Amino acid sequence: MPEQLNTRVEDCFQLAESFFKRPFKRPVVSLKLRGQKAGVAHLHENLLRFNPQLYRENTEHFLKQTVAHEVAHLIAHQLFGDRIQPHGEEWQLIMRGVYELPPDRCHTYEVKRRSVTRYIYKCPCADSDFPFSAQRHSLVRQGRRYLCRRCRNTLVFSGEMRVE
């Protein structure tokens, strides 16, 4: 766990405690998040999950904005309970009043799509390729057969692969 991330989470909690003059329960912090989300606050589990790739690629802004954004969700939940909107007035109050940051709902980080390998299958009758996913290719290797819709012959792996 990067020390800067834990330090920023703690700083955000201390700012909130100073502002609201009360203690807040600290969350478990995890870097087990993938995909497009930069961070997620699990309110009932008191858990913060952050995306390690987006953290590495946007460290400065991530520490300043994203960490505060997610901590603000936990603070709002501990203060106001379940009956508030995720990015409602209470959360916005914390973002503006406590952290002096804009209450932005979404990040603008560039998210790289992962590359996908396609395994090219062919049929004797057709001039076209049949790109199979890794999972489908694996099933063929285990004995599953896929048939051409035109001639009903078994599709055969051409040995060609494409990365998309």
UniProtKB/Swiss-Prot annotation:
Principal location listed in the UniProt entry: cytoplasm
Indicate where this protein resides in the cell.
Answer: Cytoplasm
**Lineage: superkingdom:** Bacteria
One Pfam family this chain carries? SprT-like
Active site as annotated: E70
Which keywords belong to this entry? Cytoplasm, Metal-binding, Zinc
InterPro entries reported in the protein's UniProt record? SprT-like_domain, Uncharacterised_SprT
Q: Where does it sit, as one GO cellular component term?
A: cytoplasm
Q: Which cofactor does it need?
A: Zn(2+)
Supply the PANTHER family for this chain: PROTEIN SPRT
UniProt similarity note: Belongs to the SprT family.
Q: What is the name attached to this protein's record?
A: Protein SprT
Q: Which gene encodes it?
A: sprT
